[in-house]
A protein has these predicted regions:
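Beta-sheet-rich non-transmembrane sensory/scaffold domains
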Residues: 27, 79-663
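Low-complexity, intrinsically disordered/propeptide-like segments
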Residues: 4, 9, 29, 38, ...
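N-terminal export and membrane-targeting signals
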Residues: 49-55
Length: 663
């Protein structure tokens, strides 16, 4: 942070302190080059593999479950013999998808379509020149046990870990789900159900949905005796494409009309929600299927509804372009009155709600003709936002309510700067708090916006840490905590109890930066990120930091640990973080990129003053064609057992530890 700017902030802090009560088949040479490139990036992708296990800093594992698949090709899928039988679910309650919900005719730049002609007209506004893309059997089961093995247990009535969420009460899909008695593991083309009720973990069943070579399984949800699997697929379709553009309106280099046959690999991208009856875990039964157009973007589960968000590119190209513009949801064309359109829209953002009591159809849907949006979903509303870089860096935000699964547009607004962190946007009591970074000028600038229920500005704090960027954020009660970074990592605290007058409280500086912040009980805030060279900003290791935030005016660093690893899954994907504040545990996977590349799962315990290493489980990558990275390595718990799951392309390993004996 520049010294002058820091002094200005110190003055603000001093003045405020007087008035405030603290309240995620390559050649070796190519792989090595890719590893080197990734090592120097702030955000990383994936890598890695294998079953070799080394234990450090803890007693041996009490049990190991390895499920390996035999002869298997990456693009080959299960046969029809592997498909579960289809059965109907008993429906005790339904929601009428034709229920009338009053819709606003205008929100910001969006206008509610009155007919399909309004939709076609909006698509036609876009030039043709801007074409873009929218978007085996079990071989062995074996166990390794020792004297530290956990005692057999019945149906779990104790605590178990859940997916680490962005918003409490708003569930998110993941590659593994845990209900305390069973683990549900998504691995390439199948979902495996594992019984973890006693020490001898065992595979109960394996679900292999019907897939084509272009289908992929993405995420899971579990709700009592129902398992929900999200898959995405696309068809390569042959279509006669004829341009009706003229020289005057075509800037692509093609003059006049042309006619050709083209293969569109993304011509029909779709997202499918599969529902399985798992009341008999050993015999899952497919009970319902709901398909909607668009590439999967995100999903959430709140109460009795799953909300699906997809997007797809639209254009006027093709002989039957009008038929392609209107998406299908559960076998029906989207209603004209559910479209919000704007000039020059190039992408359809499609929202659908699915009642868990009737998952073969959508309870409601809405389509935005736009240019693509990211999703933030609070307990009261959905916010779709996108960054724009024309005429300055800014973020457009559209707000929708979703009460009882029914969508209703509320408002749209634009703020300066871009949202750089998932947790920089947060809803509380209908109001929205946003931290943005504007890096269009010579010195980047950060802002904190406080918006009311109609997205009107209530308060604004500007000129935050000029020359730095927002790396991580967390809103706890009436305090906004956030990390900015250039060469050092200040943690800031801002009082937002009065939205009209946000006030800076305190800050504390350290080397490196945190990419993820997590509340860790009373007066503590956990930071997961990287240590860096203060002069070059080059990453030198994974860093774990505990902040004392009991007095937001006088923030302190209680302890930090630097680990000699190149990448941390939790720093890039919050779902990869395991946090148990009751036991003081924090777990995550790392990657190291050397001549021998490997993943490592690490578990630390906070003892009140420092971090103590409990698990360091190393898995070396061996087969390049089955390589997976640290984001496929997860920590979970049920009762007094801790599990390390490593999902690979053709198998997965599951290792358990007895926390009562070993921690």
């Amino acid at each position: 942070m520049q010294e002058q700017n820091l002094e200005e902030w110190k003055e603000k802090i001093d003045r405020s302190a007087e008035q405030i009560t603290v309240p995620d088949t390559l050649t070796p040479g190519a792989v090595q080059q890719m590893l080197e490139e990734r090592k120097n990036r702030t955000s990383a992708g994936r890598k890695e593999h294998r079953h070799y296990r080394r234990f450090a800093g803890i007693a041996a594992a009490v049990a190991v479950l390895v499920i390996a698949v035999g002869t298997y090709g990456w693009n080959k899928y299960g046969t029809d013999d592997a498909q579960p039988k289809k059965a109907a679910l008993s429906v005790t309650e339904t929601v009428d998808s034709t229920q009338d919900t009053e819709k606003k005719e205008q929100i910001g730049a969006f206008t509610l379509a009155k007919s399909y002609q309004d939709v076609y007209a909006a698509v036609q506004k876009k030039s043709n020149s801007q074409k873009e893309l929218a978007e085996g059997t079990v071989d062995d089961l074996f166990f390794v046990e020792d004297t530290g093995s956990a005692e057999a247990k019945k149906e779990s009535s104790g605590t178990h870990s859940d997916t680490n969420l962005q918003v409490n009460g708003v569930d998110e899909g993941d590659i593994v789900k845990n209900d305390g008695n069973y683990l549900y593991v998504l691995n390439d083309d199948r979902v495996t159900i594992v019984d973890i009720r006693d020490k001898n973990m065992r595979k109960l069943s394996e679900i292999r949905p019907e897939l084509t070579e272009n289908d992929i399984l993405l995420q899971l949800y579990v709700d009592n005796d129902r398992l929900y699997v999200i898959k995405q697929g696309w068809e390569t379709q042959q279509e006669e494409i004829q341009s009706d553009s003229t020289e005057a309106d075509n800037d692509s280099g093609f003059i006049g009309c042309y006619k050709d046959i083209a293969y569109e690999p993304d011509g029909n991208v779709s997202t499918v929600l599969l529902t399985y009856d798992i009341s008999e875990r050993a015999n899952p039964v497919l009970s319902a299927t709901m398909k909607m157009d668009g590439a999967y973007q995100s999903s959430r589960k709140v109460g009795n509804f799953i909300y699906l968000f997809t997007d797809r590119w639209v254009s006027r190209d093709g002989k039957n372009w009008k038929a392609q513009v209107i998406p299908e949801i559960a076998g029906k064309k989207a209603d004209a009155g559910c479209f919000y359109v704007q000039k020059n829209g190039t992408t359809e953002v499609i929202m659908a709600s699915v009642n868990l009591k009737e998952t073969s159809k959508a309870a409601d849907h809405m389509v935005l003709l736009d240019s693509g949006r990211q999703v933030y979903m609070g307990t009261d509303a959905i916010y779709l936002y996108q960054m724009e870089y024309e005429r300055g860096e800014k973020t457009k935000i559209a707000k929708f309510s979703y009460k009882n699964g029914m969508f209703s547009a509320i408002a749209e607004t634009t703020v300066k700067g871009a949202i750089r962190d998932t947790f920089a946007i947060s809803e509380s009591g209908g109001e929205l708090r946003i931290l943005t970074t504007d890096s269009q000028n010579s010195l980047s600038e950060n802002r904190l916006y406080l918006l009311d229920a109609d997205l009107k500005k209530e308060g604004l704090l500007e000129n935050i840490a000029k020359g730095e960027e927002i790396y991580a954020a967390r809103y706890l009660g009436n305090i906004a905590y956030f990390i900015t970074y250039h060469n050092t990592d200040p943690l800031f605290a801002v009082d937002i109890s009065d939205p009209a007058h946000p006030k800076p409280l305190g800050n504390v500086k350290m080397t490196g930066y945190s990419d993820y912040l997590h509340p860790f009980g009373d007066g503590l805030l956990l930071g997961i990120g990287y240590e860096t060279n203060a002069k070059t900003s080059e990453k030198t290791g994974v860093k774990l930091t505990m902040f004392d935030i009991s007095d937001p005016i006088n923030l302190r660093i209680l302890d930090s640990v630097t680990i000699n690893e190149d990448f941390c899954s939790a720093a890039e994907n919050y779902k990869c973080a395991f946090v148990d504040t009751g036991r003081g545990l924090v777990g995550f996977a790392t990657e190291t990129w050397t001549k021998t590349n490997y993943n490592r799962y690490m578990l630390f315990q906070w003892d009140g003053t420092s971090f103590v290493k409990k698990i360091s489980l190393k898995k070396i990558q061996q087969k390049m064609d089955t390589w997976t990275g640290a984001e496929q390595m997860r920590g979970l718990s049920s009762g007094d057992c801790f599990y390390v799951l490593h999902v690979e392309r053709d198998d997965f390993s599951l290792i358990s530890y007895a926390m009562k004996n070993d921690f």
